[in-house]
Amino acid sequence: MHYIPLGDTALRVSRLCLGCMTFGEPDRGRHAWTLPEESSRPLIQHAIEGGINFFDTANSYSDGSSEEIVGRALRDFARRDEVVVATKVYHQVGDLAEGLSRAQILRSIDDSLRRLGMDYVDLLQIHRWDYSTPIEETLEALDEVVKAGKARYIGASSMHARQFAQALALQQQNGWARFVTMHDHYNLIYREEENEMLPLCQRNGVAVIPWSPLARGRLTRPWGETTARLVSDEFGKSLYSTSEENDAQISGNLADVAEELDASRAQVALAWLLSKPGVAAPIIGPSRQEQLDDLLQAVDLTLSPEQIDKLEAPYQPHPVVGFK
């Protein structure tokens, strides 16, 4: 495993981040495919043994049970100072309504720390933009969380670049804790972030930690081949259903490059992301140890300029999806 500074912070993270949406009690969330605790723990332990030290969860994943499972596993398999733990606030959890008001943020971080069994998180991210709360209230509350020692740093997730620029400017003007990461939707078949968000992040020293780096499994198998999870994944369908013809050509080129390198499609798709300036750690979501073992090899894979061009050439602009 290789490690990199997380933007302009003192944190050093593995080049792959373990996404923890996969972990959660199936009867407590919206996704029947999540792994219960007895299946999650071996995978988390295997990730640690493979060199991953960066874990991304959220208050809302499986109604909080993801944080509970991840927290217990990390306490058992690693020292607190050996791991970088990220969680999120915004979506509804139990009787805590959706939103980013001061009251919601302060309650959410306390609830997350209780579920995780930790005194602090390394990174607290806002999961989406809250149109019902003044952004100044949100940013000042996040600063309060950092000053209280409950989060070392703060980050943001999918939003318009103009919104992120506004937030960064307000943080600088008011001396508030600044966003150090952008958790955005970015992969070989969705590259709209390259237009504005990625350049903005590079100018401001913000680390990019992409979600859905394998397009929710679409970049791991022949185009059109399906799985039970793909069939039931309504959110995934909303992300990719309008661009399948163009995406199929990219998938075909991905298969060609993978064959040239004697690598898996997933390894090549991740290696492409890792080659992008500003990308710190794509967030992967394996559900089996053999999948994780395959993905871990991506950090040692180097693509030639010709291979990168072959992967990128077919891309055409896509509708902006994943947030409002």
What are these regions (language model features)?
Residues 14-15, 80-83, 87, 119-123, ...:
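Short acidic capping loops at alpha-helix termini that bridge into adjacent secondary structure
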Residues 21-23, 58-60, 88-92, 126-129, ...:
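Active-site beta-loop-alpha junctions enriched in small/polar residues
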Residues 1-83:
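N-terminal binding-site loop/beta-alpha segment at the start of enzyme catalytic domains
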Residues 73-81, 114-117, 146, 168-174:
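Acidic (Asp/Glu)-rich catalytic clusters
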Residues 133-313, 323:
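Beta/alpha (TIM)-barrel catalytic core signal, keyed to glycine-rich beta->alpha loops juxtaposed to Asp/Glu
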Residues 33-47, 100-116, 164-169:
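Short, acidic/polar
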Residues 114-131:
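Active-site groove signature of glycoside hydrolases
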Residues 24-38, 92-103, 132:
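Active-site mouth loops of central-metabolism enzymes
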